[in-house]
């Protein structure tokens, strides 16, 4: 399938590109060992995505994590998180473990964390929400500057973990998905507002290969 990403730009061991031809171009700035991402884009959802992606290729089983230090949204549904993606096409199968900018209720989600996935190219996205519903306190609240995200791959099983400095890694969800053994991984950001950019500060990115 032909990719509709703009030509990738090399950056500190990663490449970065706009996926899905968003109206506003995205950018990346290195700050120490972290990255500030700016992105436009309509959304990462339904059958096709628009976002900015800071990525590298990983093969086999792995464990990746990142801290979202701050998040300036352009919409209630602006999304920042870790992406695992089969291709750079806008309709690619993928998984994303993400945070929203605050703990406001959003449809089925009470809290700020969410896991979503697309099983086939051009298919609809699905989401895994926290089980807690209003008026209870959020089950997975954001806690900036310490909103941590972690993704682990073991074969076709993908596990998402959330953490703050208040508590250790907690399993958010597990999902089976048949993806290629070599995938694109890294921080991703979408504005959910085609005419206004969002900004997120990603820090403390780590990765390890599993044998």
Describe every region a protein language model picked out.
Residues 1-211:
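Extracellular glycan-recognition regions
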């Amino acid at each position: 399938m032909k990719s509709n990403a703009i030509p990738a730009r090399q950056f500190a061991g990663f490449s970065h590109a706009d996926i899905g031809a968003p109206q506003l171009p995205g950018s990346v700035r290195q700050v120490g060992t972290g990255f500030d991402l700016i992105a436009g884009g309509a959304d990462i959802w339904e059958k096709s995505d628009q976002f900015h992606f800071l990525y590298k290729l990983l093969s086999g089983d792995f464990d990746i994590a990142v801290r979202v230090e701050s998040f300036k949204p352009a919409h209630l549904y602006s999304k920042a998180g870790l992406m695992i993606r089969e291709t750079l096409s806008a309709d690619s199968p993928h998984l994303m473990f993400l945070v929203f900018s605050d703990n406001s209720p959003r449809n089925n989600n009470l809290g700020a964390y969410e896991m979503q996935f697309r099983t086939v190219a051009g298919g609809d996205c699905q989401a895994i929400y926290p089980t807690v519903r209003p008026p209870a306190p959020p089950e997975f609240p954001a806690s900036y500057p310490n909103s941590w995200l972690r993704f682990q791959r073991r074969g076709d099983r993908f596990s998402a973990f959330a953490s703050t400095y208040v508590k250790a890694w907690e399993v958010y969800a597990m999902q089976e998905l048949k993806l290629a053994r070599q995938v694109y991984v890294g921080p991703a950001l979408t504005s959910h507002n085609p005419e206004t950019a969002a900004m997120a500060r990603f820090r403390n990115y780590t990765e390890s290969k599993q044998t």
